Design a protein with these regions (language model features):
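A structured, mid-to-C-terminal "fold-capping" secondary-structure block
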Residues: 31, 135, 140-233
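Membrane interface segments of multi-pass transport proteins and intramembrane proteases
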Residues: 53-69, 134
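Bacterial N-terminal signal peptides
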Residues: 13-24
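Short N-terminal segments immediately surrounding and downstream of signal-peptide cleavage
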Residues: 32-46
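Sec/Tat signal peptide C-region and signal peptidase I cleavage site
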Residues: 24-31
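Mid-length scaffold segments of soluble, non-membrane domains
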Residues: 80-155
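N-terminal secretory signal peptides that target proteins for export/translocation
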Residues: 1-9
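Short alpha-helical hairpin
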Residues: 31-33, 48-59, 82
Length: 233
């Protein structure tokens, strides 16, 4: 379930919030990118069932009992940890300016922000970048390949799935020797991520599987091209 949160839950929220990027003319193209739908749909149902009966109730309970300032602070801490991966992929993509911004964010948030509890970087005008190795592979020219829904990991593509391995080495959990502390950190990350996305569900309409697929493919293209998506018109 730990991996489930950091991937499926976070991407679920991004998909909902980026739903406006999904243009009707692109739906057919998205469907053509899903030749493995017969496999993907059952896996999607499995993931969604876990979310409905396990992760979502935990997130709702967490949100109900956690003061907003504490919830925000915890979320900021995990974002600060994630900025290390953003920085690494900035460099791999040759984005020098973005790398400088993310370096500054990590330094200021870790020190003045008390290990990231306070997001002083954003208040200083240092906007957070969102990069991963799947995007890096896209920038390097590797095609996304077919759409793929991974058990517990959620929506992906062949390219993005292969990018998860390098990304995993940038996560802090494998470097925490104390097993109970490591497990607690993972669980809190899972629940906090899902709780921050509860309000995003209202954006879903129609067939949930198709909505998530189409939004995911559009979102990833948008991110790989840094918003410079070609217009079909």
């Amino acid at each position: 379930m730990e991996v489930f949160a950091s991937n499926w839950a976070s991407r679920f929220g991004q998909l909902c919030l980026c739903a406006g990027l999904v243009l009707l003319p692109a739906l057919t193209q998205a469907a053509e990118s899903d030749p493995w739908e017969g496999f993907n749909r059952p896996v999607f149902t499995f993931n969604d069932t876990i979310d409905t009966y396990a992760l979502k109730p935990l997130a709702q309970g967490y949100q109900a009992i956690t003061p907003q300032f504490l919830e925000d602070g915890i979320h900021n801490v995990f974002n600060n940890v994630g900025d290390v991966g953003n920085l690494a992929n900035d460099l791999l993509q040759g984005k020098v300016e973005e790398a400088g911004i993310d370096t500054s964010r990590v330094l200021f948030n870790t020190t003045f922000g008390l290990l990231g509890f306070f997001d002083v970087g954003t208040k200083m005008g240092l906007q957070r970048n969102d990069e991963d190795f799947g995007q890096t592979l896209g920038v390097w020219g590797l095609n996304s390949g077919p759409y793929l829904v991974l058990p517990l990991l959620g929506p992906s593509t062949v390219r993005d799935a292969s990018g998860k391995i390098p990304d995993s080495f940038l996560e802090p959990y494998s470097y925490i020797n104390d097993v109970p502390a490591r497990n607690v950190a993972r669980v809190v990350d899972v629940v906090d991520t899902r709780a921050s996305l509860l309000s995003a569900e209202k954006f879903i309409s129609g067939d949930k599987y198709s909505f998530i697929r189409n939004a995911y493919l559009q979102m990833r293209e948008f991110k790989v091209k840094d918003g410079e998506v070609e217009d079909d018109f």
